[in-house]
Amino acid sequence: ENLINDTVKNLSWQDFKIKMSALTNDKVVFLVDELYEYEGITFYGTPWIAPIHWQTWAFEDIQNEYDEYICPYEKIQNCDILITHENPNYNEKLEHYCFGKYKHHFFGHWHDGISYGHLNQYNCSILTDSYLERERPKIVTIELSKNDN
């Protein structure tokens, strides 16, 4: 995460995305408020989190503290897979703006937060709240048909 924090501070979003793609031999597409289609399946990604007042992190939505602004979650489009850093169960704005727009939602940030399988919401964090690797990471298997779109 330090690489991401340092990179975000020094690069534009487009430069950051190009760098992440190069570092992974084009195997990772970093989504910043955008839709991406792969083999007929649509993904929407947004990295923003609400500010954490005791520390500065990459992808904090610092405008979240103001009364009038455009919430980045308003941009979320209909998709098969929604990928967010923030957990919709702990962020009312995310929960509100993503409601009904996805078939499955994968998120992290609240590392020990729970998943709601009956709502197709899955906490996919691979670290615990203590920043230790999980002994048994959660594996989520979903079935999406290209015909579902």
Predicted features and spans:
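Conserved beta-sheet core of the metallophosphoesterase superfamily
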Residues: 87-149
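Conserved catalytic scaffold of divalent metal-dependent phosphoesterases
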Residues: 1-97
